[in-house]
Amino acid sequence: NTIPYIKSKERAIKYGNYFKKQILKLKKINPKAMFLIIGPADMAKKQKTEMITYPILVEVISALKNAAFETNSCFWDMYLNMGGENSIIDWSKKTPSLAARDYIHFTNKGAREIADLFIEDLMNDFKNYLENKNEN
């Protein structure tokens, strides 16, 4: 995971540009390929005596969204779907826990929960697509 190693907005933008180049390379190999980028989950680190979301996380997500949109790819925001800032802390406190006490990884139940959220969004978007397709 790159989040702990990205320390500035400039590095986040550079990471997003690198990611964009990787998508473009794959599209060059297969121009018909479609991509769905899944953004990173919330993750936290200790600051003084409390756990907080990595401060650079939102910048990295923004850079990845830009890379996705600039390459006509789709983007699913896992961070936002979890609940945003400090949500990993809430997920770890649930019973049963949805996130490990490292505040980075999901438990098996948490992985199923995030998968369910993703599938729900995907199916809703597909339903909207079919409705709009039939109207046109």
Region roles according to the model:
Residues F19-I23, K27, M34-G39, M43, ...:
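Conserved, well-ordered alpha-helix/loop/beta-strand core segments that scaffold catalytic motifs
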Residues N1-K14, D42-M43:
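Oxyanion-hole/transition-state-stabilizing segment in secreted/luminal serine hydrolases
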Residues D42-N136:
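Catalytic His-Asp segment of secreted/periplasmic serine-dependent ester chemistry enzymes
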Residues I13-K20, L24, R112, D116, ...:
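Amphipathic, non-transmembrane alpha-helical secondary structure
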Residues I29-P31, F69:
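Short, structurally constrained coil/turn elements
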Residues E10-Y18, I52-E59:
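Alpha-helix N-cap and loop-to-helix initiation/capping positions
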Residues N1, P31-K32:
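Proline-aspartate-enriched helix->loop->beta-strand connector
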